[in-house]
């Protein structure tokens, strides 16, 4: 399965909460899995406790993989300080935040300022072709939502390479 992700240069993201991060911190086998599988991204929820403070667990995870993302940014639980404290590989915008602000004239300024702290911005809530075009038009690094078909991991090899490159 790792061959698929590596061949297409795509990432497989996994949502983790505080307890899961603690488990990874204490489990050498999972740490090795993350080190040896560069296509796995860890999405840390914005609900992670004290996200804006120094945190030895997040710092440790950042030593295991370059693919640590902050999830649900804009839902109101993290400040810019959280982005300054940790050098995340990507920031995923909260679905409601993206859908509320994407058509406002100041949205590109918000994205531009976020990119100063983390160049890879992902939009959650891309539900149709218009949202997808908008996310590409403002230079977002990635998009997630119902616009993209969901398939079981066991069928991932069936994804058409042309479809992936057209995104």
Where are these regions (language model features)?
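Short loop/turn elements that form and flank the Walker-type P-loop nucleotide-binding site
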Residues: 37, 63-64
């Amino acid at each position: 399965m790792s061959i698929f992700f590596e061949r297409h240069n795509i990432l497989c993201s996994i949502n983790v909460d505080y307890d899961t991060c603690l488990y990874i911190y204490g489990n050498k086998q999972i740490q090795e899995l993350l080190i040896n599988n560069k296509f796995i991204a860890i999405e840390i929820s914005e609900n992670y406790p004290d996200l804006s403070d120094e945190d030895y667990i997040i710092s440790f995870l950042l030593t295991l993989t370059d693919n640590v993302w902050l999830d649900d940014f804009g839902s109101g639980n993290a400040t810019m300080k959280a982005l300054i404290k940790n050098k995340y590989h990507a920031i995923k915008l909260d679905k409601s935040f993206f859908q509320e602000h994407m058509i406002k004239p100041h949205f590109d300024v918000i994205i531009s300022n976020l990119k100063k702290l983390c160049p890879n911005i992902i939009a959650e809530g891309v539900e149709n072709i218009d949202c997808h075009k908008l996310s590409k038009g403002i230079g977002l690094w990635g998009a997630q939502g119902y616009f993209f078909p969901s398939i079981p991991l066991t069928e991932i090899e069936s994804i058409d390479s042309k479809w992936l490159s057209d995104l």
